[in-house]
Amino acid sequence: MNGEWKSALRLQIEALAKRNELHRKSSVDEIKKRTVDMDKRIVKLRELVGSSANDAALFYLECVCHADETERLLNRGSSVGKEKKWKKVKRKTSSSVAPPLSRTISSLPGVSSPDVIQTIDVSALEDQTPQRPHWWDQFQLYRRTDLLRFSKQNDRRELWRTQKDFFLSCLGFMVGVGHTMRFPAKVYQHGGGVFFIPYLFSLIFFGLPLVFLHLSLGQYTGQAANTAFQRLMPIGSGVGWALVVIAIPVAVYYNIIVAWAIHYFFQSAKGLLLGDELPWETCRDEWQLDNRCCNLHNLHSCFNSTNSITAPEAFFHSEVLSLSTFGDFALGPLQSHLVLSLAAAWLLVFFGVFKGLGSIAQTMNVTATVPYLLLSILLLRGISLPGANKGLTFLFTVDSTKLWKWQIWKSAAEQVFYELGIDAGPLISMAAFSRYRNNIYRDSVLLVIMDALTSCLSGMVIFSFVGFIASESNSNVNDVLKHDPLYLSFTVYPGVTSFMYWGGLWATLFFGMLVLAAIDAEFAWLEMIASAFMNHFSMKNKAVENRLLAFLCLAGFFLGLPLCAQGGIFVFHAIENLNANWNSFSLALLSVAIVCYVYGIDNYLTDISAMLRVPRIQISKATRLKEKLIYFFGPGGIYIKFSLCFICPVILTVLLVASVLGYQRISFAGRPIPIDYEIVAWIVMIGPLLVVPLVAFMQIRQIRNEGKLLKSLFDTSEWRESQDDSLEPKDLYMRQSGKFESPPNRRRTPTIFTHRENTYMYIDSRGPTVRSRVFPLGASLDPYGWKAGRLRDRQQQIEETASNYSEEDSATTNSFMASTVKHNDDMELTLFGSPPAILGDDEKIMTTRFSESMPVNYKCRNVEVPRIPNKLPQNMERMARKTRKKRSSPSASDPPVPTSPLPPPPKLQHCRSEPPMMNSKESHSPEIITPGDDSPSISNSSDDSSDDCFRRATVIRRKTSDDDAFTHFSTATAESISITPLDFPRQRSLSSVAIYDQEQKNGRSKVLSQLKRPKPIDMPPK
């Protein structure tokens, strides 16, 4: 006990020394003098620990007060006279100590004497209520001294608060400009409802599989795209980095759409509040364009002439984009209104992401749901307009003659890539913050369904307004737009509001919806870029991440300024036409090839099925319908497997070849744009593909410098753990030929539970978590022990193997072991670990074996649980006496006594509240520990009464395999549970505190450490 006390004190001293090293970094002379003085104190303190522990503890308190005073001086100097954010905590310098220190020392053995407790005086805190922080404190822009203090607190990875936040964030990322602006433009361009056929085909056969691939990669690894592919295999890290790099130009040019929507929102709100007419209702003389401008209320005469456009189209090109003519391709000066709108857009993005997942989730709850409400309101208003049926008929009419053009299939594939966001890695990054056991396949299916429904809803809203304009202008739907339909949301809908009552209100709602739908995708792009760099440099400090996000927003604003120029629309148009094209098809094809063909689709689906706890089913005639559906359409089923292996590669290859062979120059308003803008678009969108060979070359160079073989480029050791580590790769073994050769390569097989989920209280929920589960209180402690064990041996295995062992071996297969420690007159039943190693003269160890013929008092999960009689000491003595008698008087002439079959242990289904199994092929059965001849005698004294308070018991479990249930008796594992007297009235559950290590040689599993509790108490301390 004294050794443990000293060890804990030495740990406190080392922590104090590290704290002094942090203080030493200050440049203040007074602080330097205090650190030198602290060094001398620490040297003296280390000497006192060996000689006098009590004196060392008291002197340690003085050192802590000295360090606290030094830290107060540091904080006072860094604040530069400013008022503190939190109220100061005043302590007595003579005998003050921090609460964690007092709890640590008081809980150590040997410090429970009254004289020691009196010397450690903890003064009461005068005021612990913090002041309300200022609004600028939310930005967490700390000084360097504050970063040193907060770095350890923030070194923890965030998770989504709920799975609803994760789903809404993914939905908000998908639902945006691709639905409200791009999808109606594609339908309008390809002649209506015929576009739905290739669109739905693309969603089903490579949209959903690729969404599931991205989400499962992120959730399985818990990392961004670059680190996820790095863990899969080093040669694939280039694909992950390409998915990150390609997001940078997309995030820059994507935000200019938000800037346009903000400008329209401001103009609409201005007209609504001031009561003025909307600026796009009538034509103006300063709008000098090549086409004739027509007022909305004079559409009949306007559309009878050629080269005429509506007032909303003229407003967008002349007022918003500041184009003089469609043939003027000069870049021109910056437009002040677009610069201000772009700055507002990046400010909104920063306020949405600066608090991490918490702020993103809160923002996404609004931006992902409010657009659906606004779209529903706009749809009801749109279908009530005269002529709306004309536009809806155009939307749902299928012209089969256009179905055989390859352009429509290419456009549908591009639209699917653009909508779902599978052309980059935001889905991987968002899934990395999800729980490990989350049903990611269900989320993938729901996201794709919601994506298709949103596209249909947006199309109905836009085309109801297009039909209304066509009816008012007495023209066909095909003739409403004279220019590129890509900007249909900014040219069609503003004109509709002029014919409505409260047109300013409806315009404000529409463009507010457009801002919300577009900006949440920007959150995902920025968070993915920041997460990739934070993971690459192994940083988790929130202050550093916030500064990185602020830098990305500032850099995005300056990089987006060329798009705010007079000719910036041409650069935007070139990038928009090349996005989700060659780059998306190439990266998707490389991702599928690495996962399905290099790593192996069967291996990957086995890993994901183990993560989701979905078995790989083999169907037969007796298979139920539910299992057949899982076999064909489950996460590891035929649909996903063949879609990723055959359909996706074929379609992506055909689309890539068709895009290369059918490439045409980019044009705007019927005129080809200058080659300079097109080259910029090529560099921005196709350039990230060069990252793949560049990173692969760097990986090869690193492998050669480390002296490894090239096959290590395809090493998957970081992806999943190996079940069989008994044979080391560097070991040599003798074959039949007698030559020493290298052992054959063994394919790593996945385990049902990963190594890290056996860690105690793993915060990421990757595996069974320790969670409360209330059990009925019985008359004994045995149900607790049986419930804590993972007893999964079947009756047939026990009956077949029990008869092959001797009576002595069979006595060690199915039992429950408990140990009691007697401290003078108090009896204690130890529920954890082996009996105490150091016992005094007055302490006795009693170990007993409960027989297999115990009565049963109740059932737990429909499994009978044996019950320990109330009088435990008497039964222990009687059973131990019988065992000694059998062992002491054996007779060689006696016939062998047949061993009766042992009762099966209870089968417990795996649940998150129970301790995890060691691996997928291991199960546990209890072991009987019978006291041998050298065991201490068990006396049936009066002290061993049934009224004694049993506080602990020990469960010893034996690890066996399915193939040989009782052969490896040498590999025993122990798992600990804790029950204190206060746990019984509260009905506390059992919690696993054993930490296992799966990466041990020869397949042995050992207990690395056991968390020990202090001595149980009967009532809370005063």
Swiss-Prot record:
A single MF term (Gene Ontology): amino acid:sodium symporter activity
Organism: Caenorhabditis elegans
Complex formation: May interact with STAT family transcription factor sta-2; the interaction is probably direct.
Bias-annotated ranges (Pro residues): 893-907
CDD domains the record matches: SLC6sbd
Gene this chain is encoded by: snf-12
Superkingdom as given in the UniProt entry: Eukaryota
Residue ranges with Low complexity bias: 933-943
Keywords per UniProt: Cytoplasm, Membrane, Symport, Transmembrane, Transmembrane helix, Transport
Protein's UniProt name: Sodium-dependent transporter snf-12
Organism placement in taxonomy: Eukaryota, Metazoa, Ecdysozoa, Nematoda, Chromadorea
InterPro entries attached to this UniProt entry: Na/ntran_symport, SNS_sf
Cytoplasmic side: 1-165, 214-241, 359, 434-444, 520-550, 606-641, 699-1022
Tagged with keyword Cell membrane: no
Transmembrane segment boundaries: 166-185, 193-213, 242-262, 338-358, 360-380, 413-433, 445-465, 499-519, 551-571, 585-605, 642-662, 678-698
Listed result of changing G193D: In fr2; almost completely abolishes induction of nlp-29 expression upon infection with Drechmeria coniospora or upon injury. Induction of nlp-29 unaffected by osmotic stress
Chain spans, region Disordered: 867-948, 995-1022
Subcellular location(s) of the protein: Membrane; Cytoplasm; Vesicle
BP GO terms, sorted: glycine import across plasma membrane; positive regulation of antifungal peptide production; sodium ion transmembrane transport
